[in-house]
Amino acid sequence: IGPMLIDRYAFTLVESGNMALGMSLISLFSPAFFGRIDPGPARRRAWMANFSLLVAALYLCVGLVHHATLNLALVVCIAVLSGYSVLQYSDVRSSYPPDLTGRALSVFTMAMFLGVGLVQSLTGWVADWAQGLGLEPYRAVMATIAALLALGSIAFRWLPASPLLQHPGVQGKDLA
């Protein structure tokens, strides 16, 4: 976000840093908020898919809209809404029997870091490609992130749910 604010709107390093700090502070608390409003195993997967589509739309708007105040508001919304990702941990916990939960959470965490690395690599390539064509890189990067989130949401909807989510009483009390 910092480089985009500097390149698009001539923000100073301090101004863009303040925005990054604000986003970081919001990101500290938004997962706790989503943890408190977790709808439970029956509706959690739909929430995750829908929030990822909403965040995808916000990223697309950041890429397409060239208005500093609106982009700042969109980025703050992304920071607030990205707390929904904590629901994925609850979903993993609810999807595996207690003796496999630790391993499942470890695999999920490693897969998430792999995904972050792949997206960073891909968006770096997209930015270079866009610049080579004389296009604004931030538009291409934000559109790519939006497309990846939308594709991920669609794939998640098609993945079969765990049988434990269909019969939550099998595992005992849902602590997620």
What are these regions (language model features)?
Residues 63, 143-176:
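Multi-pass alpha-helical transporter architecture, strongest
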Residues 45-60:
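Structural signature of the two symmetry-related core transmembrane helices
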Residues 83-97:
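Intracellular juxtamembrane helix-capping segments at the cytosolic ends
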Residues 12, 125-147:
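A membrane-interface helix-boundary motif in multi-pass transporters
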Residues 69-86:
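Hydrophobic core of transmembrane alpha-helices in multi-pass small-molecule transporters
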Residues 1-15, 128:
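Short amphipathic helix-loop junctions that connect adjacent transmembrane helices
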Residues 30-43, 127:
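Helix-to-loop junctions at the C-terminal end of transmembrane segments
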Residues 98-131:
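A late C-terminal transmembrane helix in Major Facilitator Superfamily
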